[in-house]
Regions:
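Short hydrophobic beta-strand element within catalytic cores of glycosyltransferases
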Residues: 38, 54-66
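C-terminal alpha-helical cap of glycosyltransferases
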Residues: 103-105, 120-139
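A short, well-ordered alpha-helix in the C-terminal region of glycosyltransferases
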Residues: 107-121
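Conserved sugar-transfer catalytic core signal across GT-A, GT-B, and GT-C glycosyltransferases
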Residues: 25, 43-47, 51, 72
C-alpha cells in the first residue's frame, strides 16, 4: 500500500493484510497465495508466470503510463495466463472484481496448465535459441 497509505478501516479484515513495502517477504507471500491480483509490470507478470499463480492483472491505464502494462496484460490474457480487469472498468464498477475472482477460480486449472506449457518459462531453451541464431548468422 506504500508508506503512510495504510487504510485503517481494513485492518480488522480476516485474510487480508496491508504492507507498506514488501522486500524479502515477497517469496513467502507468493508461496502462501492461492492467486495474485496485481498491476501488469514486466517483473511481476514474469514472477507470476514462473510461479504459475492464477492471477488477475489490473494494468495501469494509458493516461498513467506508457501503455506497456496494457500490452503486457493483453499478451498474458491472449496466452491464457491471466484474467485482465482494466482499471477504468474497476473504478467505474467495483462489483466486477468478485466476478473476475469467480472466473479465475472456475478456470484455475486452465490458467495453470497454460502457464506450465509456456515456452517463456524455459529460460535455458530461450537463451540457447538466441545463441544458436547468433552462431547461425555468423556461419
Amino acid at each position: 500500500c506504500g508508506k503512510k497509505n495504510e487504510d485503517k478501516s481494513l485492518s480488522d479484515l480476516a485474510y487480508y493484510r496491508q504492507f507498506p513495502y514488501v522486500n524479502q517477504e515477497l517469496a513467502y507471500l507468493y508461496q502462501a497465495a492461492d492467486f495474485v491480483i496485481s498491476l501488469a509490470g514486466a517483473n511481476v507478470i514474469y514472477e507470476i508466470l514462473a510461479l504459475k499463480k492464477p492471477n488477475i492483472l489490473i494494468p495501469l491505464p494509458k493516461k498513467a503510463s506508457r501503455g506497456d502494462q496494457i500490452l503486457n496484460a493483453e499478451s498474458f490474457s491472449s496466452q491464457g495466463f491471466s484474467v485482465v480487469l482494466p482499471q477504468e472498468e474497476l473504478e467505474e464498477n467495483p462489483a466486477v472484481l468478485p466476478d473476475c475472482l469467480e472466473k479465475l477460480h472456475e478456470n484455475k486449472e486452465k490458467y495453470i496448465k497454460a502457464m506450465e506449457a509456456s515456452r517463456e518459462r524455459d529460460g535455458r531453451r530461450n537463451v540457447l535459441a538466441v545463441i544458436q541464431s547468433v552462431l547461425d548468422g555468423k556461419s
